[in-house]
Amino acid sequence: MNRIMIVDLVNDLRNKNLEAEEYIERTYEKIGKYDKYINAFITIRSKEEVLKEVKESINKGGKLAGVLIAIKDNISTEGIRTTCASKMLEDYIPPYDATVIEKLKKEGAVIIGKTNMDEFAMGSTTETSYFGPTRNPWDLERTPGGSSGGSGAALAAGYVELALGSDTGGSIRAPAAYNAIFGLKPSYGTVSRFGLVAYANSLEQIGPMARNAEDLGLLFSIIAGPDERDATTINLNLNFELKERSVKNVRIGVLSDILEMSEKPVSGVIKDVVNKLSSEGALIEDTKLGNAEYALPAYYIIAMSEASSNLARYDGVRYGYSKYMEGNWREVYAKNRGEAFGMEVKRRILLGSFILSAGYYEEFYLKALKVRNLIKKNLDELFKKYDILLSPTMPILPPKIGEVINDPVRMYAMDLNTVIANLAAIPALSMPVGFYSDLPIGLQLMGKYLSDIYLINISSFIERNITKLYNLTASVKI
């Protein structure tokens, strides 16, 4: 366990306490040794090109000068392949950078590569990728969570200190929990989605992933902020400042209805953390979300409906996979899409189209929107009583590769604890709090809208004073 932070790394590179060549050589050596087993990256940039950019960045300066960062492969990067882990976009190279990438480059970050993910971010285990599954560095027989599993695994393996993911229903927080790292699903509208390949617009956010709370906050403050190219962003200054917050008198509601639905090894670790928070002076109460059992079906109805609409643009003609160009447009459309989309993506498109069809729109979609509003109202009431809501991030330990991929209902149920924050547009953070049989367990902290930085500071207190778990690197057993 190492206390070095990004600010220390930037200073070491600038002062030549760490030479750029050594930094790059060490990183690529580790990737070369382990990633044939982990499969965290879809695309890795050449060592020479990255070293050149790192040196230039160190000379220019910036909050992230010379720091390598891994980017989830559904975020547009100019000149770097962006596949969404799909055959449909296997060779797509964007002509522009996403807003978050522009902001990172401005502060000197250097992209090392694009990370593996569930195809079009549809999945909870990073097994639906066209490029093969990503494996968990803590146990190569198990999944790293999804859909941002490649970013989580790259951090856990120690390839990089920072990564970006996207979170539609838990896709940052699940890999954070399963890889013993920190991940934040920001408040909706705090981070621009311009350049994010859309899955479900009303639910998803780009967010930071890091190996400790301080770095998480720094990365969030860099990517957050308004963007005229994304009308959903809000005009708000979210500069992060690490504050040694105590949890004394912090009102914490433990979501007992969610906690009790978790596996015993998971709930046991979480209850131990809750007891320690209480001994530090936190005001702990058991509470219930109310209507929690409806959150998951409402989420999937909304997400699949938006997915079927968003993915209609991949017609096999304008861009993307276009092997079949003869016959009428229906044949071209069906053949190209049928061959280029994976099974899980097809399933969600079909279900979404069904939900939005005549006769079912009111029965399913409109009712799901009503449930969404009900959950928002329930949370508004809870946040009048509590500063933070606490639960396990994931209800189960990391499943083995192949264990849930062919059981969609079981895979969807993995998102039980995380979809709530997406439905309500509130921030939610996952942090490592313990292990069971050497498998990481994550704690989820949810706060009221725009309390992102408050959550990060609370997580910093917990990591420093209670769990002492930060900057963890898995000992990869190959």
Curated annotation (Swiss-Prot):
Q: Does the keyword Aminoacyl-tRNA synthetase apply?
A: no
Q: Does the keyword Protein biosynthesis apply?
A: yes
The transmembrane segments are none
Gene Ontology terms for molecular function? ATP binding; glutaminyl-tRNA synthase (glutamine-hydrolyzing) activity
Q: Which UniProt keywords apply?
A: ATP-binding, Ligase, Nucleotide-binding, Protein biosynthesis
Q: Which HAMAP family match?
A: GatA
State the similarity comment.
Belongs to the amidase family. GatA subfamily.
Name of the protein in question: Glutamyl-tRNA(Gln) amidotransferase subunit A
Organism listed in the record? Saccharolobus solfataricus (strain ATCC 35092 / DSM 1617 / JCM 11322 / P2)
